[in-house]
């Protein structure tokens, strides 16, 4: 990565990065401006449910954690825009250096992912209540719920709602998957507004895709994005009993 590349990296149009916390059945996002009792800044903020949004674009990446006795290993990757984008998976243990552990198309590396590293789908969404672009990450239980919902519904023709679903159990693990629902259909004015808003996302993702086409510099991959800190508390790792396999070809892109 050279001088121009460093100073001209694409900037995400998303203003808020949210994710589902299955262990508690909550949707949260990181707010760096929240002042904590100890005077420090930054905390997870819980979203009010049901949460309404419009889906504009989808991408995918690998992320997750592998807790250890003394340190935790974090897994993360670049953002893959197209199905054939090369995904570079990194690991970082404690304060140690980041290391590349896998690289290739998802179909070629999915069986080689270490325990704790999981596929995540990032939804670029428009939130009417805040009138802005945001990013919603679906992983684990929330990804499974989203895939099933998207198979049965026209997700690009209506606003979507997200709320706490019924408690589910896998082995000894109890968690709350989200429940997605269909809200009102887009009228002509809304369609025009969303099409205009989507242009900035498409432009950003084109830059990301172009970067993936040339090469993925490990220095360009976020190592500690605040919005993902603490995600190991989302829900316990579900036991690998063969029932959690996600058919990647069923993810709607």
Can you describe what each PLM-predicted range is?
Residues 1-130, 170-171:
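OB-fold ssDNA-binding interfaces and closely related basic DNA-contact patches used
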Residues 1-21, 207-253:
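Acidic, gly/ser/pro-rich intrinsically disordered tails
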Residues 36-40, 100-111, 145-152, 188-211, ...:
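Polar/charged alpha-helical tracts
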Residues 53, 131, 180-181, 228, ...:
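A generic alpha-helix propensity feature with a strong bias for hydrophobic helices
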Residues 58, 171-234, 253:
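Long, highly charged low-complexity segments enriched in Glu/Asp and Lys/Arg with interspersed Ser/Thr
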Residues 94-95, 139-140, 187:
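Intrinsic-disorder/low-complexity, polar/charged segments
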Residues 118-183:
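Extended serine/threonine-enriched, polar tracts that run as long, contiguous segments within proteins
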């Amino acid at each position: 990565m050279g001088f121009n590349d460093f100073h001209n990296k694409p900037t995400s149009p998303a203003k808020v990065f949210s994710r589902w916390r299955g262990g508690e059945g909550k949707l949260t996002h990181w707010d760096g401006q929240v002042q904590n009792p100890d005077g420090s800044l930054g905390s997870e903020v819980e979203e009010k449910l049901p949460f309404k949004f419009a889906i504009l674009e989808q991408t995918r990446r690998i992320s997750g954690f592998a807790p250890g006795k003394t340190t935790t290993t974090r897994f993360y990757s670049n953002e893959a825009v197209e199905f054939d984008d090369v995904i570079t998976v990194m690991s970082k243990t404690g304060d140690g250096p980041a290391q590349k552990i896998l690289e290739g198309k998802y179909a070629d590396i999915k069986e080689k992912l270490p325990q704790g590293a999981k596929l995540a789908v990032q939804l670029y969404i428009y939130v009417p209540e805040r009138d802005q672009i945001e990013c919603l990450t679906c992983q684990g239980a929330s990804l499974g719920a989203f895939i099933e919902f998207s198979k049965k519904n026209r997700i690009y023709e209506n606003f979507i709602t997200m709320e706490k679903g019924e408690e589910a159990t896998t082995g000894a693990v109890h968690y709350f998957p989200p429940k997605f629902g269909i809200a009102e259909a887009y009228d002509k004015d809304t369609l025009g507004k969303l099409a205009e808003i989507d242009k900035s996302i498409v432009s950003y993702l084109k830059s990301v895709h172009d970067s993936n086409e040339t090469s993925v510099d490990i220095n360009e991959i976020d190592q500690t994005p605040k919005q993902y800190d603490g995600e190991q508390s989302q829900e316990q790792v579900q036991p690998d009993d063969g029932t959690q396999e996600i058919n990647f070809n069923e993810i709607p892109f």
